[in-house]
């Protein structure tokens, strides 16, 4: 699976995408690689033979290899655009028309004001930044995880243009802009901080071993939970309490196991 799609789904999408496009020619020194097998859908099956004839394809395996290698040689966000081309086009149409859209995301239907699509530098994934009227706040939704899109005739509302512009300039998937988290590190905590780069929040300022980050609570839970006793969350209070509750629940799990083993 890739982008939560089965290989057969990916194969059908990229075949259709590259029907009228030039392919990179790939020559392999040996053919001992993994064999990929899947069935073409009815629409692609109908045009497949014509495509082989029109492109003067003599060896089908070579043709498919060129398709997959041409696709794989794209950057990750570009591969995402290929696989979810319909989503990108529908969002771009809504932005051009200036209309709200309804989306199905993680099984829930939401009415949103779409503002822009932005690629996350840390993930190379595309996000739709919007105002969600279901949740009454600003959200980032992964374009690849939007299940359905419906057009509406309602015009997009610009809730806070200054904030939207700042998020665009300082984009990150967790919407950390203007959110602050203050953390006290032990010496070993600082050593680990230097090593753990994935999802590391933006550093702002430090006072001895107390660091302040531009970071929202969700990102803080993902990043700092792995430090255990090597850090102490000082601010904000709600994050401090949430992490404390999570650690207490974890401790209960281990204590219950110990009691059963006695």
Each model region followed by its residue ranges:
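Short Lys/Arg-rich basic patches
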Residues: 1, 20-45
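Short amphipathic alpha-helical segments
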Residues: 5-16, 57-69
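A generic structural signal for beta-strand entry/edge sites
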Residues: 35, 123-125, 207-212
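Extended, charge-enriched helical/coil interaction regions that scaffold DNA-processing
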Residues: 39-43, 48-58
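Short, surface-exposed beta-strand/loop "edge" segments at domain boundaries and coil↔beta transitions
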Residues: 46-47, 110-111, 135-141, 190-193, ...
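Core beta-strand-centered patch of the WYL/Sm-like small regulatory domain
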Residues: 73-181, 262
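Polybasic (Lys/Arg-rich)
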Residues: 172-262
């Amino acid at each position: 699976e890739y982008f939560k799609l089965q290989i057969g789904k990916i194969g059908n999408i990229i075949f259709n995408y590259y029907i009228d496009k030039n392919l990179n020619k790939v020559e392999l020194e040996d053919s001992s690689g993994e064999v990929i097998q899947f069935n073409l859908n009815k629409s692609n099956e109908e045009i497949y033979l014509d495509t082989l004839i029109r492109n003067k394809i003599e060896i089908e395996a070579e043709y498919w290899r060129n398709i997959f290698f041409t696709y794989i040689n794209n950057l990750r966000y570009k591969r995402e655009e290929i696989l979810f081309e319909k989503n990108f086009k529908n969002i771009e149409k809504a932005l051009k028309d200036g209309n709200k859209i309804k989306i199905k995301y993680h099984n829930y239907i939401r009415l949103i004001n779409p503002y822009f699509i932005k690629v996350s530098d840390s993930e190379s994934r595309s996000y739709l930044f919007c105002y969600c009227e279901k949740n009454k706040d600003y959200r980032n939704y992964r374009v690849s995880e939007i299940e359905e899109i419906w057009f509406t005739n309602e015009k997009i509302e610009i809730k806070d243009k200054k904030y939207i512009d700042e998020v665009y300039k300082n984009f990150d998937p967790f919407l950390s802009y203007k959110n602050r988290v203050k953390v006290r590190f032990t010496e070993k905590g600082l050593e680990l901080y230097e090593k753990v780069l994935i999802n590391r929040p933006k550093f702002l300022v430090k006072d001895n071993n107390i660091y302040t980050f531009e970071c929202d609570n969700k990102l803080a839970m993902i990043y700092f939970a792995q430090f255990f006793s090597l850090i102490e969350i000082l601010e904000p209070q709600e994050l401090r309490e949430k992490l404390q509750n999570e650690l207490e629940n974890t401790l209960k799990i281990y204590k219950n196991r110990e009691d059963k083993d006695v």
